[in-house]
Amino acid sequence: MIVFDVEADNLLDDATMIHCLSYTSDGMNYKTLFDYQDMRDLILSQRGLIGHNIVRYDVPLLEKILGIKITARLFDTLPMSWVLNYNRPKHGLESFGEDFGVPKPKIDDWQNLTREEYAHRCTEDVKINWLLWKDILKRFMFIYKDKKELDKFFRYLEFKMDCAATAEQIGWKLDVGLATKCVADLTQQQSDKVEELMTVMPKRKVTAIKRKPKVCFKKDGSVSSNGERWFNLLDEQKLPRHYDGEVTVVKGWNDPNPNSTEQVKDWLYSLGWEPCTFKFNKNKETGKEKKVPQVRKDGELTESVKLLIDNNPSVAVLEGLTIIQHRLAIFQGFLDCERDGYVKAEIDGLTNTLRFKHKKPLVNLPGVDRPWGKEVRGCLTAPEGYILCGADMTSLEDTCKRHYMKPFDPEYVEEMSQAGFDPHLDLAKHAGAITQDDIDAYNRGEKPELKALRKNYKVVNYSATYGVGSPKLSRETGMSIKQAQALLDAYWQRNWSVKAFVDAQKIRTINEEMWVQNPVSKFWHSLRYEKDVFSTLNQSTGAYCFDKWVAYYRKRRSNIIGQFHDESINLVREGEQNEHSDALNWAIEKLNEDLKLNVDLGIDIQYGQRYSDVH
């Protein structure tokens, strides 16, 4: 097994040649190959290959240029670092080189330098990655202790990176014409909305500082012209004439700037805004975190800002502008990233639950039920002769939650599994806010006024499971803290089994970092706070179940062009829908047989020409 790196004349899509391949098997002796046949002989003789981002770059590059098929085990230190170094802002070899005292040589020209210069860069990368691999392996062994369990986890990371690499290589057809039209339309709408917002935001006061003149009196003792202006100003400000400090005066009023975050926040604060969403910025020098209130999240106003709209309709203008700007950025991102009529579903990391972090342009896409969602998803289409299949696991997180609850509270889980069960109205009933007769009437369409009540209990159902407290719930819903606490109390009375499950889990602390083991996958997951135990285990179980389903499916078909949370987007030849559905259903059956969860997992399958047709 070797640690290796390659240098080529370009990125994967445009590379035409490999300059060199450097490697080591012991961290002491480093060799560099320039001959393609030597590279083939070396790579094909290895049972295992270690590298940084090799699944998505080095390996497909070698296969493309050398015309070989690599079957060795792949140990990719990039996703390993994502898991272990979860607070690290950069995971590139240059960053690790600074840590290890091995500077990464800087090269900007990949066509015209000598092969010795490329070889030097390549060798230094291998030195850095050897040190990184040794560090990662040692730290993972502290967590897993069992080599078989760790090997299973490494295989899992290899699989996930292979899924990402395959999707990137296939690409996703983009309707360039539709994206271009939407950019033009939204650019005009943005301009109109900015002008409208300027009419409802308060004007900005322009001030100046006035100071007492050096000479206020003439030689004859009379007041000078400068002195007269100063004393008049003091009189206007109702200040005594002996005052000699600074005076702030209003010079005029400027139009507001809707693109100024500071001005928008000042306006919202004047309306009684109480922020519920924050970003934490860390000071690199002091290490202290600064809590920054957020007006927007994922392209929409935060819940606490939306609460202002009922009493301040002008805030709805800000909501409209926020949505327009977010959607415009998506369409523009499509066009910026388009290449030969395609975009890629690229990844940018892993969460602590091992879900993909997605990368521009396919990130945070609004659903078809949201403003411009149909157009956004409608830009992603299938090429001629193909159709898209959207396959997602139905109620994945809720199913995983019921799996963990059932050993403690089987009666409630059975009730939750009944057709037509509404967890939000059930919680309201359990809290004494409504009766079963009210729920039945609502389901018949006779009590539409319960919709607002249901919305609040829906927020509680989703957020309480993940550790929300009454102050934050109050800010998000507009309820008093007392009301919010009452809802949380009702939730935990109904869902006591969640806490019972959490209490049964063991948290390990290693070098001041907390880790918890998933009971289904047996993988270890990092924890920031103890309150995150259930959310981490529930979401990671969902991610693992989804990935296992995808793994079974890929044994029959490898045509996935995108994965988002609990859905997979597959490219299918027209006329093969039945065979494709058979493969998806076979995969979920195999998964249920394999995992034997307390609640069976299910899937939903839809076909269409555009992403908007299938999800």
Stretches found by the model and what they are:
Residues 1-7, 104, 115-372, 381, ...:
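Conserved "right-hand" nucleotidyltransferase catalytic core of DNA-directed polymerases
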Residues 12, 16-23, 27-36, 42-142, ...:
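Active-site-proximal helix-loop-helix substrate-binding element of RNase H-like nuclease domains
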Residues 21, 55-67, 82, 264-272, ...:
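Short active-site loop/helix that positions an aromatic residue
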Residues 69-72, 191, 273-280, 405-418, ...:
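Cytochrome P450 catalytic domain signature, combining two hallmark sequence patches
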Residues 165, 223, 343-344, 348-351, ...:
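Conserved catalytic core of nucleic-acid polymerases
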Residues 346-445:
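Function-dense linear segments that define catalytic or interfacial modules
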Residues 569-573:
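Short hydrophobic/aromatic beta-strand micro-patches
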Residues 580-588:
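Short amphipathic alpha-helices in soluble, non-transmembrane regions
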